[in-house]
């Protein structure tokens, strides 16, 4: 609403276009008089009295309405009705990286180095929705899963402390401090597991538990480093690697916290290794290898955490989007149906919808939706002096004026039990007695006429302009319904309707009735002779006796006074409860459905509906989603739909749908595997001696992985590569089976690189060499014997016979093998059971090689040399007899247990990822199914609506942002208008029992109009818009919006001319096959018009202006079987080489004499 001169004026939704600025621009008012017809004073006088209220403040935009929420385009922008994508957007996602780069300033260009660094930095940032409320919803959404995951992690950590305690206590006397630390850690883990399983456990507590766990892990790591015996920078590397990995994958913390924690644990171990092993000769080599090992573990953690969280957030926002659509679609469908029923009576609309829905087979004739009603009264009312009124208004004010006046008439019609049929320019006609019969139909029409005259008298007093109403009423029989296939409008036909139309020829301010109507009034009104035949030739020819209403009889006045008193009493009792009359826009929302009940929502949601209607749409969706999250049971969903161990869906169709899911990040997974391979290569090149075989194996594996990465990357940038390569890439990425095979192949290559170098090392047992030198049995050799022979840890030269180099630090073989297993966790699309099988096979191969193969001697030699290293560090000297026992479990016996712990963690993470993905898929699928059903209904309703209103007009009336009192109006600079009438149809139409009282005549008219509608639907006539039919007259126009207006080529004008000629040809074809002799008269004109919608409760699209009037005159003054055009149109068509001839000067009502032309044909082909 806007304030002008202190009075309330309805806001007009101006649709000014490039071709309509001049016509849409307001002209200055004449004089300074404020009582003009188009002034705000007149507008307020037509409204119900109410105190002025301030303009409501615009509601605050929630974060979803920024870049993230794509608002529905308004009319005039070429937008279609329908769902819009909802990109919920969190601050640091892949989807927002481009936005973030673009928003960084003009110096940040896509593809630049700075942009690439910015995108890389976003990977390390915590993901968070812009809306704090939405972020809380997301955390609640995954809370149950995170709670379950955290509980299982506590169990794994209890197992880990038991393993560490066994490794520490088994070989020698344990250190009490370290044992106490592990016991405390285990006790805390058990306590935390109990806490996590409590129903009172909350989201905030989860963060606390996570950070407590990190603190315990750091303490255990420090204790393990201090308790190690013997000490070495490479001893116990697997433990911090495990801690770093579970920090990223099994602890429910944000990315930034995970990165800091992972790097913190890694740095802590490096510092401890440096401080505790300062005298080690090979300290820096091992610290460098340790740093690479930890850095690779952090990279794997990031490559696992980032896509998993992004996928979860995208699944959440997609689910929310589907729920939002599911909640909003019923509203939109209800709005569409309400709009449909505001244009067509319910009985007609429902019958048409049922026929469309059942998709009946083609019939020889189109079905006609006509009903016959006897004993009705028809009122035609015309505004006298409207032309002079319109000349004082701008285009905007004209639509505003008509809307306010006819909206008042619509309200009066509803109060007087009349059904408005149509608005034709300034003519308003309605019927009482349909669709439900009424005995007092004549009284209702007379009272309607009295109210209309009172309303226009008020306008006359306020404006000072001589306007009045001419009202004519006749009672009889009508056929009502719709004709044609497009732009349906409810209408009535019959001889009685024709007669009622001519009854308009009355004195201004009087109600003109026929004797048939008078008979139904039962003497309740005083009348006088109307002498209608003196003013209308049709009435004279038909010998119609007419009367003028003088006033109500005394009895009728008393009845009306009593009714008015009852209405006032009722209105006073409802005062303050009922709002002022405005077009209906509020619709109740239906949220419960079968699928939603499956998701945890039942009919109890209806109890909160009243509160929900007060929420804005975004808050309503969040409120509903919050209830759904609280109500759903993860365990129940798993039990009902997912197999327990395999995590496959119980239903085959669901499993097939899930298997068709495409993971677009698969190329990134393979790239991460390549990165892990590079780290393994660097570690082994740094720690172990080089060999030609080793370098050859690494080069081959690198080439294979690089080819795999490039092949998968083609999927994302396919246009740059050959078609065959693109096809191969698509076949890998889009197929879950193919991508799984490629993923397993990549992990096998990385695993091969981790173990291949073991076969190039020296496999001679040191015990055998030393025993031979000392002349003792190999079983008697101890670390003290090796110390006496000056054997030490870290020498690359062969210690015994042979030329193969010595691999002194097999801990890194174990570490590299663990990295290769961790690389499998990056491939999120591989099923948990598939990963478990792969880990089992790879672990079994490694253990067989370790325990039974030649590489086992490398680990035996390492254990002995590590003992020598410990003796050297202690500076104590022992002989071979009293040499102390080894202070640790042999590495090759520790490795199977380490593998078991890692395999358990990897499997739990795989289960968590797959379970989350499948439950998200299931929830989204349930919401999608209902959404698709609603979309089908929406598209179905939309097709019906577009058969009533143009698309942009329907979009305007269905827009959620539209205000109740907004009008639709559009100024169009150059529009071609056509009126095509069947000149002699009135002679053909007769009402006889043989033709079902005229229904068969209307059936033929329906076929004719349907043919015209089918022609206008052709692609070549896409610039044309059917406006309406008026009896047997067909009205169309072209160039009414930006998509159909051709300013330069004027193709929309020639299209209408071609259409007019097609109608002439079609009429000849109809005459040949129906054995009739219908004659068409067609009139064409061009110029500016005002297009808009009149009627608030029952919107009716129409166009107004001098252009329309002249076009109608071209039809009425035309010649049968000819197309008459104006001079303006002649100039355009002649320039296009159309064939025209001059008719000469024609007298046109209201315009004087005009030179017109006949259109004979199109341009030469």
Curated annotation (Swiss-Prot):
It is a multi-pass membrane protein. InterPro entries: A/G_cyclase, A/G_cyclase_CS, AC_N, Adcy, Adcy_conserved_dom, Nucleotide_cyclase. The modification Phosphoserine is found at residues 53, 553, 573, 659. Glycans are attached at residues 790, 875. Detected in brain and heart. It is an enzyme of class 4 (lyase). It catalyses: ATP = 3',5'-cyclic AMP + diphosphate. Keywords: ATP-binding, cAMP biosynthesis, Cell membrane, Cell projection, Cilium, Glycoprotein, Lyase, Magnesium, Manganese, Membrane, Metal-binding, Nucleotide-binding, Phosphoprotein, Repeat, Transmembrane, Transmembrane helix. GO terms for molecular function: adenylate cyclase activity; ATP binding; metal ion binding. Residues 1-149, 304-670, 911-1165 are cytoplasmic. Mg(2+) 1 binds at residues 382, 426. GO terms for biological process: adenylate cyclase-activating G protein-coupled receptor signaling pathway; cAMP biosynthetic process; cellular response to forskolin; cellular response to vasopressin; intracellular signal transduction; negative regulation of urine volume; renal water homeostasis. SMART domains: CYCc. Phosphorylation by RAF1 increases enzyme activity. Phosphorylation by PKA on Ser-659 inhibits the GNAS-mediated increase in catalytic activity. Phosphorylation by PKC on Ser-553, Ser-659 and Thr-916 inhibits catalytic activity. The modification Phosphothreonine is found at residue 916. Activated by G(s) G alpha protein GNAS. Inhibited by G(i) G alpha protein GNAI1. Is further activated by the complex formed by GNB1 and GNG2. Activated by forskolin. Inhibited by calcium ions, already at micromolar concentrations. Inhibited by adenosine, AMP and their analogs. Phosphorylation by RAF1 results in its activation. Belongs to the adenylyl cyclase class-4/guanylyl cyclase family. PANTHER family: ADENYLATE CYCLASE TYPE 1 (PTHR45627), ADENYLATE CYCLASE TYPE 6 (PTHR45627:SF11). This is Adenylate cyclase type 6. The lineage of its organism: Eukaryota, Metazoa, Chordata, Craniata, Vertebrata.
């Amino acid at each position: 609403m806007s304030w002008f001169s202190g009075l309330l004026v309805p806001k007009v939704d101006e649709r000014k276009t490039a071709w309509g600025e001049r016509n849409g621009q307001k002209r200055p008012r004449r004089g300074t008089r404020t009582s003009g017809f188009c002034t705000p004073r007149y507008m307020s006088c037509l409204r119900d009295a109410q105190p002025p209220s301030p303009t409501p403040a615009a509601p605050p935009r929630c974060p979803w309405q920024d870049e993230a929420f794509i608002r529905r385009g308004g009319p005039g922008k070429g937008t279609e009705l329908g769902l819009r994508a909802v990109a919920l957007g969190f601050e640091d996602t892949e989807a927002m990286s481009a936005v973030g780069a673009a928003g960084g300033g003009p110096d940040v260009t896509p593809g630049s180095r700075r942009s690439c660094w910015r995108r890389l930095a976003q990977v390390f940032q915590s993901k968070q929705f812009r809306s704090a409320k939405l972020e809380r919803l997301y955390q609640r959404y995954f809370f149950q899963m995170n709670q379950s995951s955290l509980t299982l992690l506590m169990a794994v950590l209890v197992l880990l402390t038991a393993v560490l305690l066994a490794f520490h206590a088994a070989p020698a006397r344990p250190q009490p401090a370290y044992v106490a630390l592990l016991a405390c850690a285990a006790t805390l883990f058990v306590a935390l597991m109990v806490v996590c399983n409590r129903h009172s456990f909350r989201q905030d507590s989860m963060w606390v538990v996570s950070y407590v766990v990190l603190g315990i892990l750091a303490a255990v790591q420090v204790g393990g480093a201090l308790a190690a015996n013997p000490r070495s920078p490479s001893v116990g590397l697997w433990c911090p690697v495990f801690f770093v990995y579970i920090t990223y994958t099994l602890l429910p913390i944000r990315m930034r916290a995970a990165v800091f924690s992972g790097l913190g644990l890694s740095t802590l171990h490096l510092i401890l290794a440096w401080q505790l092993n300062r005298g080690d000769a090979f300290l820096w080599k091992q610290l460098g290898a340790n740093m690479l090992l930890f850095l690779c573990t952090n990279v794997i953690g990031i490559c696992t955490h980032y896509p998993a969280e992004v996928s979860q957030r995208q699944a959440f926002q997609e689910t929310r989007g589907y729920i939002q659509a599911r909640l909003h679609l019923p509203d939109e469908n209800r709005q569409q149906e309400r709009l449909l029923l505001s244009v067509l009576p319910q009985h007609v609309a429902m019958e048409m919808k049922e026929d469309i829905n059942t998709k009946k087979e083609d019939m020889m004739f189109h079905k006609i939706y006509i009903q016959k009603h006897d004993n009705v009264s028809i009122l035609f009312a015309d505004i006298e002096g409207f032309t002079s009124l319109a000349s004082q208004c701008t285009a905007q004010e004209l639509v505003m004026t008509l809307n306010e006046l006819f909206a008042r008439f619509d309200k009066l019609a509803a109060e007087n039990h009349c059904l408005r049929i149509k608005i034709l320019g300034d003519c308003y006609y309605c019927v009482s007695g349909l669709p439900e019969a009424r005995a007092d139909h004549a009284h209702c029409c007379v009272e309607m006429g009295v109210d209309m005259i009172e309303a226009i008298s008020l306008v006359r007093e306020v404006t000072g302009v001589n306007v009045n109403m001419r009202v004519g009423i006749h009672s009889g029989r009508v056929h009502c319904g719709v004709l044609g296939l497009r732009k349906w409008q409810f209408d009535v036909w019959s001889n009685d309707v024709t007669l009622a139309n001519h009854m308009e020829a009355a004195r201004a301010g009087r109600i003109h009735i026929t004797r048939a109507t008078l008979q139904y009034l039962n003497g309740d009104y005083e009348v006088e002779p109307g002498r209608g035949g003196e003013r209308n030739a049709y009435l004279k020819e038909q010998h119609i006796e007419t009367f003028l209403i003088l006033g109500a009889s005394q009895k009728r006045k008393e009845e009306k006074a009593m009714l008015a008193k009852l209405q006032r009493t009722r209105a006073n009792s409802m005062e303050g409860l009922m709002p002022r009359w405005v077009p209906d826009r509020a619709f109740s929302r239906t949220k419960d459905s079968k699928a939603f009940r499956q998701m945890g929502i039942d009919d109890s949601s209806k109890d909160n509906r009243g509160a929900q209607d007060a929420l804005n749409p975004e808050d309503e969706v969040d409120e509903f989603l919050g209830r759904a999250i609280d109500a759903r049971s993860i365990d129940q969903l798993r039990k009902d739909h997912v197999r327990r161990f395999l995590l496959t869906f119980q239903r085959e169709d669901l499993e097939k749908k899930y298997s068709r899911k495409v993971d677009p990040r698969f190329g990134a997974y393979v790239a991460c595997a390549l990165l892990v391979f590079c780290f393994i290569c660097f570690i082994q090149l740094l720690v172990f001696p080089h060999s030609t075989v080793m370098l050859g194996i690494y080069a081959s594996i690198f080439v294979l992985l690089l080819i795999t990465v490039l092949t998968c990357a083609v999927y994302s940038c396919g246009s740059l590569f050959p078609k065959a390569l693109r096809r191969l890439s698509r076949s890998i990425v889009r197929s879950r089976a193919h991508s799984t095979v490629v993923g397993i192949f990549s992990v096998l290559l990385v695993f091969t690189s981790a173990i291949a170098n073991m076969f190039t090392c020296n496999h001679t047992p040191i015990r055998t060499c030393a025993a031979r030198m000392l002349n003792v049995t190999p079983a008697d050799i101890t670390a003290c014997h090796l110390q006496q022979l000056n054997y030490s840890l870290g020498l690359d030269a062969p210690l015994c016979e042979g030329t193969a180099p010595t691999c002194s630090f097999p801990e890194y073989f174990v570490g590299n093998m663990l990295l290769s297993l961790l690389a499998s966790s990056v491939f999120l699309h591989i099923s948990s059971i598939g990963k478990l099988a792969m880990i089992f096979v790879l672990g079994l191969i490694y253990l067989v090689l370790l325990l039974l193969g030649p590489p086992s001697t490398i680990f035996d030699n390492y254990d002995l040399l590590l003992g020598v290293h410990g003796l050297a560090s202690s500076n104590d000297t022992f002989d071979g007899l009293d040499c102390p026992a080894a202070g640790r479990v042999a590495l090759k016996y520790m490795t199977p247990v380490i593998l078991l712990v890692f395999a358990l963690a990897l499997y739990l993470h795989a289960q968590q990822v797959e379970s989350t993905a499948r439950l998200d898929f299931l929830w989204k699928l349930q919401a999608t199914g209902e959404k698709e059903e609603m979309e089908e209904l929406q598209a179905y309703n939309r097709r019906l609506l577009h058969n009533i209103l143009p698309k942009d007009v329907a979009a305007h009336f269905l827009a959620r942002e539209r205000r109740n009192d907004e009008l639709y109006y559009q100024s169009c600079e150059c529009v071609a208008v056509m009126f095509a009438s069947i000149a002699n149809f009135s002679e053909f139409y007769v009402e006889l029992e043989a033709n079902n009282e005229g229904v068969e005549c209307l059936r033929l008219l329906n076929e004719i109009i349907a043919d015209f509608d089918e022609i206008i639907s052709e692609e070549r006539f896409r610039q044309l818009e059917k406006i309406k039919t008026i009896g047997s007259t067909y009205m169309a126009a072209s160039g009414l919006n930006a998509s159909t207006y051709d300013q330069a080529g004027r193709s929309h004008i020639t299209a209408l001319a071609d259409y007019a000629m097609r109608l002439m040809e079609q009429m000849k074809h109809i005459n040949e096959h129906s054995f009739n002799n219908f004659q068409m008269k067609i009139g064409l004109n061009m110029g500016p018009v005002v297009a808009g919608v009149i009627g608030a409760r029952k919107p009716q699209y129409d166009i107004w202006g001098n252009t329309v009037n002249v076009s109608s005159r071209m039809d009425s003054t035309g010649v049968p079987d000819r197309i008459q055009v104006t001079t303006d149109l002649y100039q355009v068509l002649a320039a296009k080489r159309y064939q025209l001839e001059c008719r000469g000067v024609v007298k046109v009502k209201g315009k004087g004499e005009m030179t017109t032309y006949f259109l004979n044909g199109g341009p030469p082909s």
